[in-house]
């Protein structure tokens, strides 16, 4: 009964119209579905392939950047430590050891210049002589000249290393630190994106509340709806074609044309729903593009900075570090050059310092012995003992003469043995061979205490007074 009503109320033209509308709508639906599928694939590729690949690449680059940054900083610090330990020590030794020792020697030489040597001390000399005139001044000047050359070379080397190594290392270190801090700040900007991607990778997209997860989840649901609508419209088109065939053959009663009519009437609404879904898919694609436009510049900028820094690092490690190393080695060899023999465990500063200290010690002893020992001994030998000898002689060659000669000879020998090395050879010091002796009852060595007529000279006048004044002045 129903089929008869349907067949009677639905004409062949209506069914043909439905089929044409179904075909047209299906064709448009297929095109929209194709475009929608392309849009979703593009969005999925951007969110699941492009961004992950970019992030993976920048993570690899940044890891390499961090390793190279740490490595070069360590090299710079190692170079600075080496300079401080092996090079700066040379300059510190000059300041702490060599310069003070040189100053002490100059002070003692100045004291030698102030210490007068009377004519009685050295025969055939004029007044105005000082102890300084009896030093190895040429050797001392040569030593000081060599020390001056050494210090001048060290100063030039220090300026060279400060300018060409230390300053440039500090500049490079500051530049590296500045670029590193800038890169870290930029890298931190993509940290949320990295976390979002990790959450997306380790969890299903339909469970992620992140932007990318939401987009992918929405597109998956929309894709399912598109498939459902496409299947429904395809089925409706098939039913329409079947209805046309049945009605044309007079078998229209075999179909429920009422349902087909309702489907045909709902077709515009279904297509509208399809276009709405497609609009959402396009909006998701646009959102994805904006998302990329927000993050990709940072990723690209970080990538460019890191690549640029890695290139700078490579050049620094292959060109600058070897150049610094070679320059330091050359300077270190120059700093070891010395005009005197140097042991393996000594530096030129230590050798020069030791020599200066030995000279200073020698001349300190020289002055002290001259003032406290030599002048008194000279007075004894030229005035005190001759008077004693003459006194004994006047006692008609008392047997004590022989004894005091022996005593005096031994005393002079001991004195010469103890202090003689500090007395210049030009200085007058009779010694054992000028002991007063009796030669045919003619006295010798008493000229300082006797007048030409053989009478005793008045004490504390002439040479003796000068000598006594110097002894007295030395003891003050």
UniProtKB/Swiss-Prot annotation:
It is a peripheral membrane protein. Keywords: Autophagy, Cytoplasm, Membrane. Belongs to the ATG17 family. GO terms for cellular component: Atg1/ULK1 kinase complex; phagophore assembly site; phagophore assembly site membrane. Autophagy-specific protein that functions in response to autophagy-inducing signals as a scaffold to recruit other ATG proteins to organize pre-autophagosomal structure (PAS) formation. Modulates the timing and magnitude of the autophagy response, such as the size of the sequestering vesicles. Plays particularly a role in pexophagy and nucleophagy. It comes from the Eukaryota. One of its GO terms (biological process) is pexophagy. The keyword Repressor does not apply. InterPro entries: Atg17, ATG17-like_dom. This is Autophagy-related protein 17. It is found in: Cytoplasm; Preautophagosomal structure membrane. It comes from Candida albicans (strain SC5314 / ATCC MYA-2876). GO terms for molecular function: molecular adaptor activity; protein kinase activator activity.
């Amino acid at each position: 009964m129903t089929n008869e009503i349907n067949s009677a109320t639905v004409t062949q033209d209506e069914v043909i119209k439905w089929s044409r509308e179904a075909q047209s709508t299906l064709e448009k639906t297929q095109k929209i579905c194709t475009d929608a599928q392309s849009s979703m694939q593009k969005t999925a590729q951007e969110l699941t392939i492009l961004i992950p690949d970019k992030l993976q690449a920048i993570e690899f680059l940044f890891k390499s950047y961090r390793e190279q940054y740490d490595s070069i900083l360590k090299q710079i610090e190692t170079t600075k430590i080496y300079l401080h330990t092996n090079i700066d020590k040379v300059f510190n030794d000059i300041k702490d050891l060599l310069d003070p020792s040189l100053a002490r020697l100059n002070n003692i030489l100045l004291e030698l210049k102030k210490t007068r040597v009377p004519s009685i001390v050295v025969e055939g000399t004029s007044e105005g002589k000082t102890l300084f005139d009896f030093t190895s001044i040429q050797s001392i000047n040569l030593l000081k000249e060599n020390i001056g050359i050494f210090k001048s070379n060290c100063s030039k080397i220090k300026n060279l290393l400060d300018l060409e190594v230390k300053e440039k290392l500090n500049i490079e270190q500051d530049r590296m630190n500045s670029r590193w801090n800038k890169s870290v700040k930029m890298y931190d900007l993509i940290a949320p994106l990295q976390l979002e991607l990790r959450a997306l990778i380790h969890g299903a997209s339909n469970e992620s509340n992140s932007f990318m997860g939401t987009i992918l989840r929405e597109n998956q649901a929309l894709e399912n709806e598109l498939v459902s609508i496409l299947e429904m419209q395809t089925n409706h088109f098939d039913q329409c074609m079947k209805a046309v065939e049945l009605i044309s053959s007079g078998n229209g009663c075999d179909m429920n044309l009422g349902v087909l009519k309702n489907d045909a009437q709902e077709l515009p609404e279904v297509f509208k729903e399809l276009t709405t879904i497609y609009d959402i898919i396009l909006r998701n694609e646009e959102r994805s593009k904006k998302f990329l436009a927000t993050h990709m510049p940072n990723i690209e900028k970080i990538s460019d900075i890191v690549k640029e820094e890695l290139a700078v690092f490579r050049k620094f490690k292959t060109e600058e570090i070897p150049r610094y190393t070679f320059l330091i080695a050359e300077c270190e060899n120059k700093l070891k050059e010395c005009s005197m023999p140097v042991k393996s465990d000594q530096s030129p500063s230590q050798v020069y310092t030791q020599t200066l200290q030995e000279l200073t010690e020698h001349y300190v002893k020289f002055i002290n012995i001259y003032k406290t020992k030599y002048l008194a001994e000279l007075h004894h030998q030229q005035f005190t003992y001759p008077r004693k000898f003459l006194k004994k002689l006047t006692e008609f060659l008392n047997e004590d003469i022989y004894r005091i000669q022996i005593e005096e000879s031994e005393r002079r020998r001991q004195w010469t043995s103890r202090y003689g090395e500090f007395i210049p050879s030009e200085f007058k010091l009779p010694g054992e061979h000028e002991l007063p002796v009796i030669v045919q009852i003619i006295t010798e060595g008493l000229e300082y205490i006797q007048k030409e007529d053989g009478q005793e000279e008045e004490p504390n006048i002439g040479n003796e007074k000068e000598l006594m004044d110097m002894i007295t002045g030395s003891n003050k």
